[in-house]
């Protein structure tokens, strides 16, 4: 059928990534805010009650690798257990031979009716454009996730 359409379909450029910058007065606070920012892409963390606790211990040789493993572990918890994190996170970050995080995440099973859906499903963490730096009296963590 003839009409004014140019073609039946067209593929356009689309970026399937989201860049996140998380800030904190301390490195620990920045890592906590990185976790909350990740969760907020999918649901409303302020609606999550801290009913259950999940302990996480991770380590890595450098801070960039530690950030990657931190976000990757949070994605794993949501993907496999549908564990929605609340804004209540107890996090200890330190360094012995390697950097480590010992954290307790508080939350509950994800419920779309209660927690909502903010529009994105995060598929994976990436090292693309990752940056961790101290700026004056605060820290900035930057990372990109694939959605």
Curated annotation (Swiss-Prot):
<dbReference type="InterPro" id="IPR022952">
    <property type="entry name" value="Archease_arc"/>
</dbReference>
<comment type="function">
    <text>Activates the tRNA-splicing ligase complex by facilitating the enzymatic turnover of catalytic subunit RtcB. Acts by promoting the guanylylation of RtcB, a key intermediate step in tRNA ligation. Can also alter the NTP specificity of RtcB such that ATP, dGTP or ITP is used efficiently.</text>
</comment>
<dbReference type="InterPro" id="IPR002804">
    <property type="entry name" value="Archease"/>
</dbReference>
<keyword id="KW-0106">Calcium</keyword>
<dbReference type="Pfam" id="PF01951">
    <property type="entry name" value="Archease"/>
</dbReference>
<feature type="binding site">
    <location>
        <position position="17"/>
    </location>
    <ligand>
        <name>Ca(2+)</name>
    </ligand>
</feature>
<dbReference type="InterPro" id="IPR023572">
    <property type="entry name" value="Archease_dom"/>
</dbReference>
<keyword id="KW-0479">Metal-binding</keyword>
<comment type="similarity">
    <text>Belongs to the archease family.</text>
</comment>
<dbReference type="GO" id="GO:0005509">
    <property type="term" value="F:calcium ion binding"/>
</dbReference>
<protein>
    <recommendedName>
        <fullName>Protein archease</fullName>
    </recommendedName>
</protein>
<keyword id="KW-0819">tRNA processing</keyword>
<dbReference type="GO" id="GO:0006388">
    <property type="term" value="P:tRNA splicing, via endonucleolytic cleavage and ligation"/>
</dbReference>
<dbReference type="InterPro" id="IPR036820">
    <property type="entry name" value="Archease_dom_sf"/>
</dbReference>
<feature type="binding site">
    <location>
        <position position="146"/>
    </location>
    <ligand>
        <name>Ca(2+)</name>
    </ligand>
</feature>
<feature type="binding site">
    <location>
        <position position="147"/>
    </location>
    <ligand>
        <name>Ca(2+)</name>
    </ligand>
</feature>
